[in-house]
Amino acid sequence: MFRVGSWLYGKKPAANASTQSLDSLVELRDLEDAMRAATLILNDDVDGAEAGLAEGTSAFHNLGRGVVAFIRATLGFEQDIMRQASERLNEAETSASVDQHRAQHNSYAPNTYHSPMYLPGTEFALCQAIAQLMSAIVGVLNESLTESIKAFYRLRKAYITLDAILKMEQKYMEESRAATLVESTTSGSVPSSLRHSSSNLHSSSSSISSAKGKEAAADTLAAPSNDTDVQERLADLNLSGEPAVAEDPGQTPTPINTDILDHDPDSDIFQNQIDVFVHSGSNFCFGVLLLLISMVPPSFSKLLSIIGFHGDKERGLKMLWQASKFHNLIGGIAAFAILGYYNGFVRYCDIMPDSIPGKDGDVQGYPQKRLELLLAKMRERFPKSQLWLLEESRMSGANKNLDRALELLCGEERSPLKQVEALRVFERSLNAMYLHKYELCADSFLECVDLNSWSRSLYYYIAGSCHLSLYRDAKETDSAKAAKHAELAEKYFRMAPTVAGKKRFMARQLPFDVFVARKFAKWEARAKEWKVSLVDAVGVDPIEEMIFFWNGHSRMTDEQLQESLQKLAWSESSANTTWSREGPEEKAILKLLRAAVHRSLRKHTQAKEMLEDILGQDRTLFKGHLKDDWICPVAHFEMAANLWMERPTYIATHGGAKQDSNKESARPASVNDALQYEREKVRKCKEYLEKAAKWESYELDARIGLKVTAAMEAVQKWESTHPTL
C-alpha cells in the first residue's frame, strides 16, 4: 500500500522529461497570466481569453484553454465545443503531469518555490485533477456510453488526487496547532489566533514544509515507476492506511478541516498565489465532486459503484463557498456553481433540509442574504457579463418575482458568447411560460432552436403547446384567430418528433425527447380514433404539464397559481367537446396537476384528497403503449411533499397552510406533541418517497429521481437530528 506522497510525488520523471528546474518567479508569472486571461470569459470576453492564453505554453495556460472550452461546453451542450473541450483538457492533463514530475525531481533547486503547506508539484497535481474532473463532466454529457463510463473513472482519479491535497492541508493545520501548543507551553502564553503563530509553521522539527522530510518520504515510499496501467495504480493506492477506495464503495473521504475553511483570502497562510490556487482549486473541485455525486438519481445509482465513494452535499457546499471567497478564476467559477445550484436545483426540488440558524450555517437550505451578497460581488467583478445578469434573473424567479426575472432577460444587450445568449433566451422562454405569456414563450423557444441544438424537439413542442393554448382561448370568440393558432400549433407539434432522438445523454435518448415523441404519437392515435383534428385530440393543457415538470409552481405567486387553475379548468368546460371520451389516465393527469397547484397554494387537504384518488386506482391503468406511466410515481412524490410541508418546523419557517379542515389545521398543544406530530409526518413522507424511489423504470424517471434523491437526503438529515429515544 502507498501513501499520499508516494503516488503524487514519488514517481520518477519520464525519461524524456526536461530536467530544467521550474523557477518560482516564472511559475508564478505563468499562473497569474493564465488565470487572468481565462477569467475574461466570466466577463463574456471569450476572444480576450483565447488571445491571452495563446501567449503562453505552460501547464497553467493549457489548463486555462481547457477551462474556457469547458465553460462553453457546459453552457451550451454542443458536440463540437465538447470535443474541443475534451481535447484541450487532455492536453492540459498531460502537460501538468510532465511539470509535476519535473517539480518533484528538482525540489532541491534553490530557485523553486517551497510551500509551507503542500508538497512540491502539488499545483500541477491539482491542474491534472481539474482537467480530469472537467473532462469527466464533458464525458458524461457526451452522447457515447463508452465516453460516459470512462468519465466515471476520471472522477475517481480526480477524487484520489484531491483527497491527497486535502490531507496535506489537514496535516499542516494539525502540526501548526501542535507547534502553537508547544510554544504556548514554553512561553506560558496562549496566542489569540493561529495566524500569529506563523513563525512556528516553518520550524524544521514540526513543519511539513521541510524539504528533507519531503525527500525522505518520497524516497522511502517511492511508487512503482511503471504507471501505464491507471486502474492497477488506483487499485493499489491507499490514502489512509485503510482499505483502498476502490475496494470499499462506502469509504468516507478525508474529514472536512473546518479550521482551514475559517480562513479568508487575507489570512497569513495564503501569502503566495500558488498556495491560493491550490487551496481554492482543490476546494472547488472536491466540492463540485461531492455535490454532483450526492445528486445522482436512483436510476443511475449503479454507476456509483464505478466511482467507489459517496457524495456529501453539505461538505461539498461548504467547500464551494470557501472557494468562492477568492478573487481569481476559481472563485468566479465556484460562485457560478453555487448560484446555479441554489437558484436552479434547490428551487427545482420541493423537499429540502430545514434551514439552520447561525452565520453561514444554512448551506443546505436557501441562504438568501448570502447569495445576494455573492451575486452582487460577481456583478461588480464582471460588469459586462450577461451570465451574472442571468443569475440575477434566476434568483428573482426563485424568490417568486417572475415579472422582474423576465424583465431582466428582455433587454437589448446581447452576449457575444453564443452559449450565454442561448441560456438567456431559454430562461426567458421558461419565465414567459410560467407567466402564461404564450406568444413570447413560443417565439423565445423558436429562437432557442437556432441558438442551441440540445433539445429542439422540446422547443418545438412547447411552441406548439403555446399556440394550442391561444387556440383554445380564441376558439369560441374569434374563429379566424383560433384557426391561425391551430395551424401553428399543429405545425410545431408535427416538427417536434422529427428532431427527437438527435441528441443523447450517456447513449440514452434525452428524457423529454422520449416524452415529446410519445405524446405526439398518442395525440395522433386519438385524432384518428375520434375523427378530430390533431389540436382537438390533445388532452390536459400541455403548458401546465410543462410548468409542473419544470417546477414553475414554486416560482409563482398565489395570483399566478390561480391562473394555472383557470387554465386547467378548460378541460372540464363545455368548450372541450372531447372530455367525455377521456379515460382515467388523462383525468388523473388533471387531478395531479391541480394537486400540485394546491400544494403550492398551501392547501394541503385538497391536494392530498386528489392524490389519494389517483393512488387508489389500479396502477395498470397507467401502463402500456403510449400511456403516461409517470403518473403514479409522481403522485407518490407529491404526497410526500405535502406531508413534508405540513410539519410544524416547515410552517414556522414558511408560514401556515391554508386549510379548510379544522382537524388538519389544528396545531399540537405542547412541544412534545409537536415533535411527535412532526415525526409522524416525516415517517409517512418517507414511506411515499421510498415507493417513488423503488418504482420500476418510467418516463422521466431520471428527472423525477433528482427530486426523490434530494428528498430522501433531507429526510435522513431530519432523522439524524431527531433520533428516537
Swiss-Prot record:
Complex formation? Interacts with lipid droplet proteins.
- Functional note: Inclusion body (IB) resident protein that interacts strongly with lipid droplet (LD) proteins. Involved in LD-mediated IB clearing after protein folding stress, probably by enabling access to the IBs of an LD-stored soluble sterol derivative that acts as a chaperone in inclusion clearing.
Species name: Aspergillus fumigatus (strain ATCC MYA-4609 / CBS 101355 / FGSC A1100 / Af293) (Neosartorya fumigata)
Q: Which Pfam families match?
A: Iml2-TPR_39
Any idea what this protein is called?
Inclusion body clearance protein iml2
- List UniProt keywords, sorted A-Z: Cytoplasm, Nucleus, Phosphoprotein
Q: What are the GO cellular component annotations? A: cytoplasm; nucleus
Chief location: cytoplasm
Q: Where is this region: Disordered?
A: 187-209
What's the family?
A: Belongs to the IML2 family.
Has keyword Flavoprotein?
Answer: no
What is the annotated localization of this protein?
A: Cytoplasm; Nucleus
Q: Does the keyword Cytoplasm apply?
A: yes
